[in-house]
A protein has these predicted regions:
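N-terminal lobe/hinge region of extracytoplasmic solute-binding protein
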Residues: 76-128, 158, 221-222
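N-terminal secretory signal peptides
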Residues: 1-31, 55
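Structural transition elements
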Residues: 344-380, 395-399
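Ligand-site clamp/hinge motif
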Residues: 244-289, 407-408, 416
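Gly/Pro-rich hinge or "lid" segments in bacterial periplasmic/extracellular proteins
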Residues: 111-115, 194-195, 200-257, 263-265, ...
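Long beta-strand-rich cores associated with HINT superfamily self-processing modules
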Residues: 517-545
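Extracytoplasmic/peripheral linker and loop segments enriched in polar/acidic and small residues
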Residues: 412, 416-427, 453-519, 544-545
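Surface-exposed binding/hinge segments that line
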Residues: 125, 135, 169-211
């Protein structure tokens, strides 16, 4: 992606809306680029310039029909538990996301440049980024034969505002003041304030569309490319080709068995032995093994994925800002990058916006490794010469190795860290966010608004460190409705500063997505949203056996 420092004039919210409307009326991609004065820019560049409000060049996407139909594949993800769910609203793990994209569709869908493409929405119109009208495709049916209508969309979006749903994106959906059917195949969304990012928000996996009135999600009734043949939470799922899928020629595969192998070496062994065709979350140390196999390949994509040190701010010792700052100073970022991730990473700065992202604050001073200053702060906090447990698990990519490095650094500062290596099974349910010191792993989000809303807003269910900051919450709301891009960039920059300076999150690096793939799998590409092609591989790949 392009660093915004290299673009003299980023497209504003109003310009984005203007282009979006023109594209909806049939403007060509070339003319759209000319409108912005950037004719000749590559498609990837165009995606970052248009931003998430820009329309997708849906007709320019990879066309169906190029793949070979038929075949069954077996895929091994990293995380699984009895909490696995086919309810998109409750998706929490990469395993959930991958399954959800097998069985459901959204109104929009991200391409590999994080530009939202029209999917169940045939057209999206608006005049002020506050009231949006969505026209639905008329040729879409659910797996049970029911036709897609506006009522299904109203139900699917509205359920996120009900606390009983347990939606993981409930704070994000608070801006949806009203969602109503304005026709059999037309939905009107009224927001509390202008938000040019709506097409991007609608592409979030939690907002995939389900039939009106659904209460039993175990059957995975959606409009997606596959139907549920079997689903056993914590064990496996079997996805069977949807013969009535509304996208001509898709999907290619007849069946996908999806399992989880928590242990990374075992996952790699399963790939190399031919037991599975695809794996995600490959440890950089394993890339040589996969690369030496003539039958397999490594798929590497830089991303906004990060493994973070969580310092709970609602309990001691994290309540003391000196302790929190000391822990961040003990993260040797360059060593984490080279020793833990073998260079498959870029250095982070204790906030979730990755370098190269559109609103990345390049003026923010970099936190550097400084055990002497950390020692001073620990003494000031009354935390010198004590023993402190830190929870790590293979479930949080690289966290065990990072914890060991942190343990060595802390020793120099007079703090003894006791690394508790917890198993992957049950880590997210039983330990994540529940200890004074632990680790998380956050998959990339499509834009700053979604990232900040889900993980840093005071009342977000995934507010990992329990950080409460009224100024941050106010800026989040203001930035969401700001259509002047320069002002919006300033707000996001200030939010990064607040997180960097005050939040109990230490982000040493941003990690590349590394997948291992059988050479017979074709159509497989990278996506910065996450492994498994941003979890959307199911309808895009085929088996050339």
């Amino acid at each position: 992606m392009t660093d915004n420092k290299n673009i003299p004039e980023l497209i504003s919210g109003q310009e984005s809306l203007r282009v979006f409307e023109s594209l909806n009326r049939g403007m060509s991609r070339r003319n759209a680029l000319q409108m912005l004065g950037v004719a000749g820019v590559a498609a990837a560049g165009a995606g970052s310039l248009f931003g998430v409000a820009g329309k997708v060049f849906a007709d320019d996407a990879v066309a169906a029909g190029k793949g070979k139909p038929g075949g069954k594949i077996r895929v091994a993800g990293m995380s699984s538990s009895t909490a696995d769910t086919l309810d998109p609203a409750k998706g929490a793990l990469s395993t959930d996301y991958a399954r959800h994209y097998m069985f459901y569709n959204g109104l929009t869908r991200f391409d590999k440049h994080l530009v939202p493409q029209l999917e169940l929405a045939e057209r999206i119109d608006n005049s002020d980024a506050t009231v949006w009208t969505i026209t639905l495709r008329k040729d879409v049916t659910f797996h049970n034969g029911k036709s897609l209508t506006a009522a299904d969309v109203v139900f699917s979006l509205g359920r996120h505002k009900d606390p009983l749903t347990g939606s993981k994106v409930m704070p994000l959906m608070e801006q949806f003041v009203e969602v109503k059917a304005s026709g059999p195949n037309e939905v009107q969304i009224r927001l509390s304030a202008p938000n040019a990012e709506l097409p991007s928000i609608l592409a979030v996996s939690h907002l995939l569309i389900v039939p009106e009135g659904t209460t039993d999600f175990s059957k995975g009734i959606g409009t997606g490319p596959f139907t549920v043949g079997e689903f056993k939470p914590g064990v496996r799922s079997v996805a069977v080709r949807n013969k009535n899928y509304w996208k001509p020629g898709l999907p290619y595969l007849d069946e996908i068995e999806f399992i989880a192998i928590a242990d990374e070496p075992s996952r790699v062994n399963a790939l190399l032995s031919g037991d599975v065709h695809m794996i995600n979350e490959v440890n950089p140390r394993s890339t040589d093994r996969i690369g030496k196999s003539a039958k397999h390949r490594v798929v590497d994509a830089p991303s906004g994925n990060y493994t973070d040190l969580i310092i709970r701010q609602d309990q001691l010792p994290g309540k003391n800002p000196d302790f929190t700052q000391a822990m961040k100073l003990l993260l040797d970022r360059e060593q984490v990058k080279s020793a833990v991730f073998r260079g498959f990473a870029v250095v982070g700065n204790d906030h979730p916006i990755a370098p190269g992202s559109r609103y990345f604050n390049s003026d923010l001073p970099q936190t550097v490794y400084d055990p002497e200053k950390a020692k001073f702060l620990l003494k000031k906090a009354g935390m010198e010469s004590i023993t402190m447990p830190v929870m790590a698990s293979p479930a949080a990519t690289g966290s065990v190795d990072i914890a060991v490095l942190l343990q060595q650094s802390a020793k120099q500062a007079g703090l003894k860290l006791d690394v508790n290596r917890l198993p992957s099974d049950g880590y997210w349910s039983n330990h994540w966010m529940k200890h004074p010191l632990s680790f998380g792993n956050i998959n990339p989000r499509p834009n700053a608004d979604v990232m900040f809303s889900q993980f840093f807003q005071s009342k977000a269910p995934w507010n990992e460190s329990g950080w409460q900051n009224d100024q941050f919450d106010q800026l989040l709301m203001l930035a969401r409705g700001e259509t002047d891009d320069a002002k919006r960039a300033k707000m996001y920059g200030d939010m990064q500063t607040l997180v960097h300076d005050h939040c109990g999150i230490g982000i040493p690096v941003f990690i590349s997505n590394i997948d291992g793939v059988d050479q017979r799998i074709k159509g497989y590409d990278s996506n910065p949203l996450g492994g498994f092609m941003g979890y959307m591989f199911a309808e895009q790949v085929w088996l050339d056996a």
